[in-house]
Structure formats: C-alpha cells, structure tokens
C-alpha cells in the first residue's frame, strides 16, 4: 500500500501564491463583472454563485429585485477577482441555470450603460483613423487577441482607388466585440485608432421599418374611411365633396301661403359635374333635406356667380330658367292653399320681405301693388341678373355699360339713390317680385312727405313744400 507523500515546502509555497494571486484585485471592476440576463423568477444569489464559481472566485453576486414587491427583475451581476475568469466563463457558453438558458455578457461601466450603441450585441467592429501603412494583415493580427477574426475589409474610393481611412473587422462571436470595446485605447503601428461597434446596418433597417409600416397602414386606413363613410365616393371633376359641408337646416318658404314640394329621390351626380353652377334641368338637387329658399341672397352659402361674372349666356325664351338667388336648385312649384287655411309659422330668420329680389334691385314704386307670380311669369319670362344702375348682362359673361350718362360711375354695382330722376333700364327691374315699369315721363313722388299739394295733375314741389315739413 502506497502512502501519500507529504508535500514539500516548495510545492506548498506555490499553492499559497496561486491562492493569493486569485485573491488579489488589481483590475477595474467592469473588466471582472458579468451581466446575467433572462433569469428564472425563483433563481437566487446562492444558485448564481454556485454555478459561476466553477470558473473562478466570485467576490460579489446580486439578483436585481423590485423595491416594493421584492420579486426578481430577471437579471443580475457576477463579479470575479480576475478578468481572465470572465473569459473562462464566456468560453463555456451556453449557461443553463435552474433549467433556463441565460444570457451572459460583459458588464459595461455605469456611465456607458445608457448608451444605445454599447447595449447592442453585434459581431462587427468599425475601426477609424487608419493611415496608409495600415493593411488588412496588421489589423487581423491586432484583433486576434480579442477573438477569432472572420474578415477584415478596408474601404477605398471607387474613383481614385485611395483608402478612405477606416475598415470593418468581423468576429464569429459578439463577446469578442464587447471585449474589444471595453479596452478604451487601441494603438496599431504606433497610431491610436478609433474602435466602435458597427451599427450601420441596424440603423438602415430601423429607418426602413417606419416607412414600411406607414405604407402598410395607409391601405387599412383608406378601407376604414370607406367603411365608416359609407355611400358612394364623389366622382372626379369640379364638384366639391358634399360630405365636408355641414347640413343646411330647412327654412320657411318665401310667402306665408307657399308650400314646399316633396324632394326628389336621391341619385349620385354624373362625372365632371360642376357643383357650384346650376345643374341641368333634369338633375334633382344633391342633398337629402329640402332645398332652402334664399331671402335676398342672405343664406349660409351665397352663390359664387351671383353677379354673372364668367357665366354662360342666358337660355332662349321658353326654357326652364334658374334664378341667381337659388343655389343650384330649380324654382319651387307654387301652390295656392284653400280658402280658410291657416298659414304655417314663420322661420327662425323672422318674417320674409315683401319682395325677395336681387341685392341691387331698385325699390318698387310706392302705391303700386305687386303682381302675382303668374302675371310676372307671363309678362317677363326671362329674368336677367341685376348688375346695378346702368349695367346689364353681356353675352360674353361680364357686365356692359349702356349710354345712360346719369348712372353712378363711382359705385356701379350698388343700387341707385331712391330720389334719382333718371329712368333705369328694364333689366334693372326684373327682380323676382318687382312691380310693373312706371310710365315714361312720370316723376317719382318725394319721400318722407305725408301730403303733397296737387295742381293741374302735377306734383307741387319747391321750397314751400319742403319748409312745411321741416322741423
């Protein structure tokens, strides 16, 4: 039986020195620390220390927990006494703790943990600040100390062929890149170079993702809008989309005894249909509610072609006419109510005026009763738009000046003064409910007087008549 020989003094001294060397801490903490991610919820500090103690002496172990619930946050840190122990642990990956594969990475210094570049795991390094004497062989030889080098690529200018001063070094493992990054200064052939993680391809992919997602979202948004909007889409042309226009409340009719006919059935407008102009005679109005009747043009949507600028010539007599104060809808059919019928209540805009003519229509002659609609349609079948005193519509689309020298030249589009003694042209009296034309040579009575002395059939004027009512 062979007995164990006692160790000599020299062998005992070697073991003691080896233990002391492992206990000596002469390197930075982040070079001796490992980050362990993906821990199980029930993994404790004892399990971590027992597992990673097989590759070196562990001086510190911590599992990060929530301050309120004290539950594990799924990651922790292991600190060795030497950096070579970290290399041993990384060479023996993958690591399985409590039945779960964890992710072991070299820990970064605290100021660099918030940097996006250092937190990404890549296998390629960017090396900048190279000189003309730096070639691929010297780069490969230098970076072999961190891990197995797969490729080295020096970039050159395509036109001149000169080197651009930087290169890319690729490894077979991301741990070699992290190890090279933790070394702050790199000198190759006595020249300090800049070493960073190559994240160019990652930035390119991230820039492409928002555009691709936006292009994928656009069709779905269009489908949702079509489903929510419902109905028919507006055709191409000059028509404005009716969905962007608020609904117009129905107004009261012009007269107390007028009734509104029922609206025509809905139908989509034809393509290339000008929504702002009057529709063809056979086209019903393009809205669901009854068409409102404008009073003196005061409505929520005044017509843009009210004064007839750039308007087509009037249709021949006998055709269906369109009034300027009605916005793209045909004139309503007037019906006389039976005797004894109660008139409908007035609208919210107050009582309608007696003559809803155009804006620039001269006032009617006092004392003359306005004719009915049937008499007006028989006497004046073609109403012309009023352009003010002294103007009439031209077939070219704009107003034309006649030979009346007494017209108001400073304000041609406004109505004439009530006491003007010139005879206006017939187109100026073609309003909707305008009275008959006064006889030629007649003199309008003065306004504001209650009684005027009449002598031999003529109206008495002069200073005596005016001083009678002066106060």
Swiss-Prot record:
Residues 32-109, 123-198 form the RRM domain. SMART domains: RRM. Residues 221-471 are annotated as: Disordered. The keyword Methyltransferase does not apply. Residues 222-238, 370-381 have a biased composition (Low complexity). Pfam families: RRM_1. InterPro entries: Nucleotide-bd_a/b_plait_sf, RBD_domain_sf, RRM_dom. The keyword Acetylation does not apply. Signal peptide: none annotated. Residues 259-293, 300-318, 329-369, 436-447 have a biased composition (Pro residues). One of its GO terms (biological process) is cell differentiation. CDD domains: RRM2_hnRNPA_like. Required for spermatogenesis. Could be required to process a specific transcript essential for spermatogenesis. This is Ribonucleoprotein RB97D. The lineage of its organism: Eukaryota, Metazoa, Ecdysozoa, Arthropoda, Hexapoda.
């Amino acid at each position: 039986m062979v007995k164990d020989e006692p160790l000599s003094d020299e062998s005992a001294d070697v073991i003691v020195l080896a233990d002391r060397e492992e206990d000596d801490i002469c390197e930075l903490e982040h070079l001796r620390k490992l980050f362990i991610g993906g821990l199980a919820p029930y993994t404790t500090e004892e399990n971590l220390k027992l597992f990673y103690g097989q590759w070196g002496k562990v001086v510190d172990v911590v599992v990060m927990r929530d301050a309120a619930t004290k539950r594990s946050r799924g990651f922790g840190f292991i600190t060795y006494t030497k950096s070579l122990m970290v290399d041993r642990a990384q060479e023996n990956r993958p690591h399985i703790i409590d039945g779960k594969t964890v992710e072991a990475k070299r820990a970064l210094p605290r100021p660099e943990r918030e940097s996006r570049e250092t937190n990404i795991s890549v296998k390629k390094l960017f090396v900048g600040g190279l000189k003309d004497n730096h070639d691929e062989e010297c780069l490969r030889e230098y970076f072999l100390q961190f891990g197995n080098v797969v490729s080295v690529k020096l970039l050159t200018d395509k036109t001149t062929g000169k080197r651009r001063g930087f290169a890319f070094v690729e490894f077979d493992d991301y741990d070699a890149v992290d190890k090279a990054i933790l070394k702050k200064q790199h000198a190759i052939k006595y020249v300090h170079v800049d070493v960073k993680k190559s994240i160019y391809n990652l930035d390119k992919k991230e820039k492409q993702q928002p555009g691709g997602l936006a292009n994928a979202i656009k069709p779905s948004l269009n489908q949702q809008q079509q489903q929510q909007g419902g109905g028919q889409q507006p055709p191409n042309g000059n028509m404005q989309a009716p969905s962007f226009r608020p609904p117009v409340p129905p107004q009261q009719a012009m007269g107390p005894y007028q009734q509104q006919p029922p609206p025509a059935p809905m139908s989509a407008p034809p393509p290339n249909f000008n929504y702002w102009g009057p529709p063809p005679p056979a086209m019903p109005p393009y809205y669901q509610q009854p068409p409102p009747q404008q009073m003196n043009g005061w409505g929520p949507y005044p017509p843009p072609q009210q004064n007839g600028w750039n308007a087509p010539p009037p249709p021949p007599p006998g055709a269906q006419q369109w009034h300027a104060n009605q916005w793209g809808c045909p004139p309503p059919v007037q019906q006389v109510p039976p005797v004894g019928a109660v008139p409908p209540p007035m609208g919210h805009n107050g009582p309608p005026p007696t003559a809803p003519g155009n804006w620039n229509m001269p006032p009617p002659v006092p004392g003359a009763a306005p004719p009915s609609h049937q008499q007006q349609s028989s006497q004046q079948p073609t109403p012309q738009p009023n352009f003010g005193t002294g103007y009439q519509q031209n077939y070219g689309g704009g107003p034309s000046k006649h030979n009346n020298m007494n017209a108001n030249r400073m304000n041609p589009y406004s109505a004439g003064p009530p006491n003007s003694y010139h005879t206006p042209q017939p187109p100026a009296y073609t309003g909707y409910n305008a009275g008959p034309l006064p006889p030629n040579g007649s003199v309008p009575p003065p306004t504001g007087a209650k009684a005027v002395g009449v002598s031999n059939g003529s109206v008495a004027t002069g200073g005596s008549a005016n001083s009678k009512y002066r106060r």
